């Protein structure tokens, strides 16, 4: 199976084409161990690893489980955080909020900031 075929699995399930492309690249990076550069340079992908990627894409298409839950982590402010169905996935908007909070803390010389019960702990 080729990468466009795996993308089609996701788009056929209703996932937007751009999102499907990004998600397949994430699956390839995580489950096959290839970087985005490897993919863009046309490096031949191992068939067995590609089969795992295909299985994970089918799981995503069937369950519509968030891609972060399938790969087991979410990126937040340049760091990776473990997530699963028991943890809220940090959103891009939260990064904006955290950047503003950091700015507020620095500008007002606050010594303590408190983050309680906000999910994955990425804000803390």
List the predicted regions and their residue ranges.
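Non-catalytic accessory regions of SAM-dependent methyltransferases
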Residues: 1-37, 41-45
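A general structural signal for well-ordered alpha-helical segments in protein cores
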Residues: 3, 24, 53-54, 67, ...
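A generic helix-loop boundary/linker signal
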Residues: 17-18, 47, 84, 113
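Conserved AdoMet
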Residues: 29-104
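Conserved SAM/SAH cofactor-binding pocket of Class I
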Residues: 93-124
């Amino acid at each position: 199976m080729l990468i466009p075929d795996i993308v089609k699995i996701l788009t056929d399930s209703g996932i937007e084409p751009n999102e499907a492309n990004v998600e397949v690249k994430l699956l390839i990076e995580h489950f096959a161990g290839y970087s985005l550069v490897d993919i863009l340079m046309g490096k031949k992908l191992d068939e067995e690893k590609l089969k795992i990627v295909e299985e994970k894409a089918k799981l995503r298409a069937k369950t519509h489980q968030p891609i972060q839950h399938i790969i087991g982590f979410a990126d937040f402010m340049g760091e990776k955080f473990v997530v699963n169905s028991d943890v809220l996935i940090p959103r891009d908007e939260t990064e904006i909020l955290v950047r503003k909070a950091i700015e507020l803390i620095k500008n007002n010389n606050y010594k303590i900031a408190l983050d309680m019960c906000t999910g994955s702990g990425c804000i803390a």
